[in-house]
């Protein structure tokens, strides 16, 4: 068949498929995030192509930030495995992440905190006239 389309691609090698994540330089799956965004919209699934890339970049950055802080927390405690406790310490220790992530982390425990009014005053040293030396008073009566 002369003039047909059969020989159109015969001289060229087919280009290898490049994912949108690779094009954007991301590790998170842009295509999967785009699919989830489309399934959760009410306007008949119309989501711009760059919205998925931007969302994937945000999720990747936040994940990297939390994992870095949790890794530092686990390293401070001299263990090699990140646990929910380390994630809790990392998120609650950072002011911006704490305001962003309000979720309760299962198995995360609590953050130690003592209110300033409950902390005792500085110890005062008073000369005791009957004893030789200083006496430490923990509370003023």
UniProtKB/Swiss-Prot annotation:
Keywords from the UniProt entry: Acetylation, Chromosome, Developmental protein, DNA damage, DNA repair, DNA-binding, Isopeptide bond, Nucleosome core, Nucleus, Phosphoprotein, Ubl conjugation
Superkingdom assignment: Eukaryota
Subcellular location: Nucleus; Chromosome
Renumbered ranges of motif [ST]-Q motif: 138-139
Reported modifications of this chain: Phosphorylated. Phosphorylation of Ser-138 occurs in response to DNA double strand breaks (DSBs) generated by exogenous genotoxic agents. Phosphorylation is dependent on the DNA damage checkpoint kinases ATR and ATM, spreads on either side of a detected DSB site and may mark the surrounding chromatin for recruitment of proteins required for DNA damage signaling and repair. Acetylated on Lys-5 by Tip60. Acetylation is enhanced by Ser-138 phosphorylation and promotes the exchange of the phosphorylated form with the unmodified form of H2AV.
A Gene Ontology cellular-component term: polytene chromosome
Family annotation (CDD domains): HFD_H2A (cd00074)
Compositionally biased spans, kind Basic and acidic residues: 1-12
Pfam short name (any one): Histone
Phosphoserine, modified sites: 138
Region annotation (Essential for function in development) ranges: 93-103
Modified positions (N6-acetyllysine) in chain numbering: 5
Molecular-function annotations in GO: DNA binding; protein heterodimerization activity; protein-containing complex binding; structural constituent of chromatin
Gene Ontology terms describing biological process: DNA repair; heterochromatin formation; male germ-line stem cell population maintenance; membraneless organelle assembly; negative regulation of peptidoglycan recognition protein signaling pathway; protein localization to chromatin; protein localization to nuclear body; somatic stem cell population maintenance
Keyword DNA repair: yes
Cross-link (Glycyl lysine isopeptide (Lys-Gly) (interchain with G-Cter in ubiquitin)): 121
Subunit structure: The nucleosome is a histone octamer containing two molecules each of H2A, H2B, H3 and H4 assembled in one H3-H4 heterotetramer and two H2A-H2B heterodimers. The octamer wraps approximately 147 bp of DNA. H2A or its variant His2Av forms a heterodimer with H2B. Interacts with Nasp; this interaction directly or indirectly destabilizes His2Av.
Note on domains (UniProt): The [ST]-Q motif constitutes a recognition sequence for kinases from the PI3/PI4-kinase family.
Name of this chain's protein: Histone H2A.v
Organism: Drosophila melanogaster
Gene that encodes it: His2Av
């Amino acid at each position: 068949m002369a003039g047909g389309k059969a020989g159109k691609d015969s001289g060229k090698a087919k280009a290898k498929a490049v994912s949108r994540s690779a094009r954007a330089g991301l590790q998170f799956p842009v295509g999967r995030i785009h699919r989830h965004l489309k399934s959760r919209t009410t306007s008949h699934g119309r989501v711009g192509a760059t919205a998925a890339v931007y969302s994937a970049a945000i999720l990747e950055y936040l994940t990297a930030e939390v994992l870095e802080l949790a890794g530092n927390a686990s390293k401070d405690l001299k263990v090699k495995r990140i646990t929910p406790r380390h994630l809790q310490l990392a998120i609650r220790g950072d002011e911006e992440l704490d305001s962003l992530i309000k979720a309760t982390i299962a198995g995360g425990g609590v953050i130690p905190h003592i209110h300033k009014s409950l902390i005792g005053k500085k110890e005062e040293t008073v000369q005791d006239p009957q004893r030789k030396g200083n006496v430490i008073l923990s509370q003023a009566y």
